[in-house]
Regions:
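Cleavable N-terminal export/targeting peptides
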Residues: 1-29
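Extracytoplasmic loops and strand-loop junctions of Gram-negative outer membrane beta-barrel proteins
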Residues: 28-30, 147-150
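Proline-rich low-complexity regions
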Residues: 40, 86, 148-150
Length: 171
């Protein structure tokens, strides 16, 4: 049979087609925003495609150096730096401007220098998201997000919850 788990690419493509098949191209929006703390731990710049007006698909870029890492509970060795790429999909629940935002995704972490410490290894972290989102109901406008992001840390074998605030522009 064509649709079995032996063909995950086909299953994935069918799921994407179903998810976005009803998307009205004229109602799809974009957003660019700055996030402090939250999913990228320190700060990040993010691009988001708002599909079907209620499904945000996000990719971002964040950065932390050794001095900043102390503030986020993960002290790195001297001169260590890490780039973070948060990728997520979510769901907006609400009417017009005020929404509950739920989401899930992962964070790719890339350390700039090799290290012997376990918390300084390249890898992927899983994350969730719950928060409040205000966005303009016009075609363009202001965007604000207040979020809680539980992030799974495999070294600690548990979740740490980070708060975040985002400010940006919807177009």
């Amino acid at each position: 049979m064509l649709l079995n788990m032996k063909n995950p690419i086909i299953v994935f493509l069918i799921c994407v087609a179903i998810l976005f098949g009803k998307t009205n191209i004229s109602s799809a929006k974009n957003a660019v925003y700055f996030e402090y703390a939250g999913t990228a731990l320190n700060s990040s710049i993010n691009y988001e495609l708002l599909a079907r007006n209620d499904i945000p698909i996000r990719i971002g870029l964040g950065y932390i150096n050794a001095e900043q890492s102390v503030n986020f509970g993960d002290k790195f060795s001297e001169n260590q730096e890490v780039s973070l790429i948060p990728i997520a999909i979510g769901k907006l629940i609400g009417q017009k401007q005020h929404n509950l935002e739920l989401g899930a995704g992962f964070i790719i972490k890339y350390f700039h220098r090799e290290s012997q410490f376990e918390n300084e290894k390249n890898g992927v972290l899983l994350n969730g998201l719950i928060g409040y989102r205000y966005q303009s109901i016009k075609n363009r406008g202001f965007l604000v997000r207040l979020t809680l992001s539980p992030i799974y840390h495999p070294i600690d074998e548990g979740f740490k919850v980070y708060t975040g605030i985002s400010i940006g522009y919807l177009f």
